[in-house]
UniProtKB/Swiss-Prot annotation:
eIF-2 functions in the early steps of protein synthesis by forming a ternary complex with GTP and initiator tRNA. This is Translation initiation factor 2 subunit alpha. It comes from Thermococcus onnurineus (strain NA1). SMART domains: S1. HAMAP family: eIF_2_alpha (MF_00231). Heterotrimer composed of an alpha, a beta and a gamma chain.
């Protein structure tokens, strides 16, 4: 079970908790990511409406996403709230927890390759990566996308090779895809050939970058759709701007007209090879 590197959660943090015991005035919950730590949820923090019976809302053994509203490390007190967690925050926390579970499983694989137990892996890899990136899976994504060298100086050298093999095969790197349409007309007998040449030149101009993928689709005269996949939205926008400039330049020189029509961005994930 993934655990945090720090000893106590911070106020305002969302945590995964398991209901341990229920009382008329509230409930005690075990903090799954903080071994040995418990929090208390007063009945007034269970729901935004009046709660007559707390058992109508929580049950022993139930896992919930709770918000930390007070922390007193000196007394060991942690106060939690259920009513202050909205659906979007709950979804985001559960996603974060799933990513931590994936990271833990991958780190166990690397530890096995080195013949080390997970406690050693946690101390040498998990803690420094969480401190540097905020979450370990984000570090693995960075390594999968930009090379294991990004982790040099953060974790011991002996971990780099086994981790590199694992993240390149099992880590999904988020990418952004944006799409748009061009309206292009060239009033000449060879207008179609001129348009094709402009699109090919614009595509080949950026496709040398392995992290960028550009695809054109004919939508019916005079429209041509473009899909650009890149590591992030800003890079995709930069590529679209470069391509648009090239297309507009070539078409204008040929005596034609070209207009860029924008659409919405889409986000997807690409599995690394061998996944």
């Amino acid at each position: 079970m993934p655990r945090k590197a720090k000893e106590y959660p911070e106020e305002g943090e969302f945590v995964i908790a398991t209901v341990k015991s229920i009382h008329p005035y509230g409930a005690f919950l075990k903090l799954d990511e903080y071994p040995g730590k418990e929090g208390f949820m007063h009945i007034s923090e269970v729901a935004s409406t009046w709660v007559k019976n707390i058992r109508d809302y929580v049950k022993e053994g139930q896992k919930v996403v709770a918000k930390v509203i007070r922390v007193d490390p000196n007394k060991g007190h942690i106060d939690l709230s259920l009513k202050r967690v909205n659906q979007q925050q709950r979804k985001a926390k559960l996603q974060e927890y799933k990513r931590a579970q994936k990271a833990e499983n991958l780190l166990k694989m690397a530890a096995e390759k080195l013949g080390k137990d997970f406690e050693m892996a946690w101390q040498e890899v998990w803690v420094p990566l969480e401190e540097e990136y905020g979450e370990v899976y984000a570090a693995f994504e960075d390594a999968a996308q930009n090379g294991i060298e990004v982790l040099k100086g953060i974790i011991p050298e002996e971990w780099l090779e086994p981790l590199n093999e694992i993240v390149q095969n099992y880590v999904e790197v988020p990418t952004v895809t944006i799409d748009a349409e061009f309206e292009i007309t060239v009033p000449k007998p060879n207008g179609i050939e001129i348009i094709k040449e402009a699109l090919i030149r614009a595509r080949d101009r950026v496709n040398e970058d392995k992290d960028i993928e550009v695809k054109f689709t004919y939508q019916g005269a005079p429209r041509y759709r473009i899909d650009i996949t890149a590591p992030d939205y800003y890079k995709a926008e930069e590529v679209l701007e470069d391509i648009a400039e090239e297309i507009l330049r070539v078409i204008k020189q040929a005596g034609g007209e070209a207009t860029l029509l924008r659409k919405e961005k889409r986000i997807k994930k690409i599995k690394r090879r061998g996944a």
